[in-house]
Amino acid sequence: MADNDAIKVHDLRPAPGAKTAKTRVGRGEASKGKTAGRGTKGTKARYQVRAGFEGGQLPLQMRLPKLRGFKNPFRTEYQVVNLDKLSAHFPEGGEVTVDALVSKGLVRRGQPVKVLGTGEITAAVQVKANAFSASAVEKIQAAGGSTETL
C-alpha cells in the first residue's frame, strides 16, 4: 500500500447527518419560532408548573398520614448472640468474653453484646457480655455455667 493511499487521522470526519445542531426555538417566525412548539395560550405555554403540583387535587404529601411517635436517641443497639451459636463455637465450654466472640467472628467490635436464649447449650460456659435475656441466663445456669454483666 502506498503512503498517499493511507487514511490519515485528520481526514476522518463523522458521517453526513450524524451530527445535527441543537434546535434553537423562538428565533424568528419559521418552524420553531413565535410559540416555540408550545402551542397557544394556557399554563404550559407560559411556564412550567412545579414538580408534584396536581392542580386542585390534594397533593400526595398532604394525603399521606403524618409520621407519629418518636425515636429514642438514647436507645442502645445490641449485637445479638444466641445460645446455639455459643454451643457450636464453644463445644468444650470455658470462658466466653466479648473479645473471644470477636475473634470467632460472631460479633463486631465497638457495639454492646446481648446473649439471647434461642437454642440449647450443654457445656458449662462462663459468659461475660453487656446484657442477657432471662431465658439465656436460665439455660446457661442449668448447664452449670455462669453469667456476668459487663
Swiss-Prot record:
Q: Which Gene3D superfamilies match?
A: 3.100.10.10
Signal sequence region: none
> Which Pfam families has this protein been placed in?
Ribosomal_L27A
Return the Basic and acidic residues bias intervals: 1-13
Q: Which domain of life is it from?
A: Bacteria
List the Gene Ontology MF annotations in alphabetical order.
rRNA binding; structural constituent of ribosome
**Region described as Disordered:** 1-44
Per the record, what is one GO cellular component? cytosolic large ribosomal subunit
Q: Which PROSITE patterns match?
A: RIBOSOMAL_L15 (PS00475)
Annotated InterPro entries: Ribosomal_uL15, Ribosomal_uL15/eL18, Ribosomal_uL15/eL18_sf, Ribosomal_uL15_bac-type, Ribosomal_uL15_CS
Its keywords, alphabetically, are:
Ribonucleoprotein, Ribosomal protein, RNA-binding, rRNA-binding
What GO biological process term is on the record, naming one? translation
* Subunit structure, interactors included: Part of the 50S ribosomal subunit.
Family statement drawn from the similarity comment of this UniProt entry: Belongs to the universal ribosomal protein uL15 family.
Give the matching PANTHER family: 50S RIBOSOMAL PROTEIN L15 (PTHR12934), LARGE RIBOSOMAL SUBUNIT PROTEIN UL15M (PTHR12934:SF11)
What the protein does comes down to: Binds to the 23S rRNA.
Name it.
Answer: Large ribosomal subunit protein uL15
Protein source organism: Micrococcus luteus (strain ATCC 4698 / DSM 20030 / JCM 1464 / CCM 169 / CCUG 5858 / IAM 1056 / NBRC 3333 / NCIMB 9278 / NCTC 2665 / VKM Ac-2230) (Micrococcus lysodeikticus)
Q: Which gene encodes it?
A: rplO
